[in-house]
Amino acid sequence: MTLSVMPMEWIAAGGAAALGAAMGGASLVTPRWGASVVRLAPDPRWKGGWAEFRASYGGALLLAHGAVLLTLAMSFQAGSGAVMGASFAVALYWFGMAAGRIVSMVIDCEQETRTRYNAIGVGFELLMAAALGAPFLAHLGG
């Protein structure tokens, strides 16, 4: 399937998947970048913290989003069900992050979680969830 005949929902999911894969790749190669984005640092009391950034924010993001890109690239063989399934699963990942951040902003407010950074984070996570979920949502509506 060429880009000119690919549904807009698939293009949106592909763009979000490319962004997510790039973020994962950057965190895998440069864990300090991933740590700065999520505003965390390895606990100096325990060894191996950088491996967690490479794994959780690097490899996991890269390959989860890579799976969406692969199903889009192979949609002529895999079919639309594969595209919907892969993109919906990763959409739920982003929706879960937004939900967790919202819960923290409500419950953990004494920890100063109600910040502009977290509000922007919720918006970004919901945007990624919507873009990645678009193929599935379009299927429900169509």
Regions found by a protein language model. Name each.
Residues 24-25, 68-72, 102, 133:
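Alpha-helical transmembrane segments of multipass membrane proteins
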Residues 132-142:
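Juxtamembrane boundary at the C-terminal end of a transmembrane helix
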Residues 71-109, 113-119, 142:
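Transmembrane helix-loop-helix
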Residues 49-73, 92-96:
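Core segments of alpha-helical transmembrane spans in multipass integral membrane proteins
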